């Protein structure tokens, strides 16, 4: 079976989609965003196609596309859509699959189910994206604790933003996890710049093995 990698984050708006695009491009993978909330601006799938350099057929359609830009549970209620979490199964593809969640681990899909509940059922290796700015230590360690409590395999932490060596080190040490690398802020955000930035900071094979 080809590698299946779930990309999640400690919070929303930290650059998780940009990282997912870089990872999918580096692995020549297929990308899937199960639930998209908000359709007025560029969707995450659209951004990944633009930034990854992948062909359109490598971007799988979302299982749910919600018009309202809100947490999936609320967006679904406003839009009159019932999210069937049991129907959210990992697609079967012949190449590596990069799956992107929404916001953080505890984002609710329904009034009863959060993203991390689905991740636990999938049991696929997970990459935790974390910002490097103030407050990241607490948010990241809490996220790692939630992941470990559910026995989800954790590949490691991918840091996003300006260098902050002490924060990165203490997270790795106290979280007993692996630092996968750090994607810096890019002056120009396009497919070529992102590909180069990822290649300089990460080793693709670290995402293809078993969680340490």
Curated annotation (Swiss-Prot):
Domain of life: Bacteria
Binding residues annotated for ATP, in chain numbering: 13-18, 100-103, 184-186
Subunit structure: Homodimer.
Keyword Repeat: no
Gene Ontology terms for molecular function: ATP binding; dethiobiotin synthase activity; magnesium ion binding
Active-site residues, Swiss-Prot/TrEMBL: 33
Pathway(s) it belongs to: Cofactor biosynthesis; biotin biosynthesis; biotin from 7,8-diaminononanoate: step 1/2
Group of enzyme by EC: ligase
Disulfide bonds listed in the record: none
Keywords from the named record: ATP-binding, Biotin biosynthesis, Cytoplasm, Ligase, Magnesium, Metal-binding, Nucleotide-binding
EC number: 6.3.3.3
Family membership noted in the UniProt record: Belongs to the dethiobiotin synthetase family.
Protein purpose: Catalyzes a mechanistically unusual reaction, the ATP-dependent insertion of CO2 between the N7 and N8 nitrogen atoms of 7,8-diaminopelargonic acid (DAPA, also called 7,8-diammoniononanoate) to form a ureido ring.
Cofactor(s) needed by this chain: Mg(2+)
Name of the featured protein: ATP-dependent dethiobiotin synthetase BioD
Organism of origin: Rhodopseudomonas palustris (strain ATCC BAA-98 / CGA009)
Positions with a binding annotation for Mg(2+): 17, 100
Subcellular location field: Cytoplasm
InterPro entries: DTB_synth_BioD, P-loop_NTPase
Location, primary (coarse class): cytoplasm
N-terminal signal peptide: none
NCBIfam families xref list: bioD (TIGR00347)
């Amino acid at each position: 079976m080809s590698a299946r990698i779930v990309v999640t984050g400690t919070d929303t708006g930290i650059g998780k989609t940009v990282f997912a695009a870089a990872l999918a491009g580096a692995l020549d993978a297929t990308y899937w965003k199960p639930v998209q909330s908000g359709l007025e601006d560029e969707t995450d799938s659209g951004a990944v196609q633009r930034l990854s350099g992948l062909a359109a057929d490598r971007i799988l359609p979302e299982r749910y596309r919600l018009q309202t830009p809100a947490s999936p549970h609320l967006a679904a209620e406003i839009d009159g859509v019932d999210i069937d979490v049991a129907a959210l199964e990992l697609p079967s593809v012949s190449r590596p699959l990069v799956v992107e969640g929404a916001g953080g681990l505890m984002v609710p899909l329904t009034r009863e189910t959060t993203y991390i509940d689905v991740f636990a059922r999938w049991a696929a290796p997970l990459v935790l994206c974390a910002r490097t700015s103030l407050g990241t230590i607490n948010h990241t360690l809490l996220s790692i604790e939630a992941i470990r409590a559910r026995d989800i395999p954790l590949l490691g932490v991918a840091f996003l933003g300006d260098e902050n060596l002490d924060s990165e080190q203490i997270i790795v040490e106290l979280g007993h996890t692996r630092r996968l690398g750090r994607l810096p802020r890019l002056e120009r955000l396009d497919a070529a710049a992102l590909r180069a930035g990822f290649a300089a900071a990460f080793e693709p094979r670290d995402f293809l093995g078993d969680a340490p």
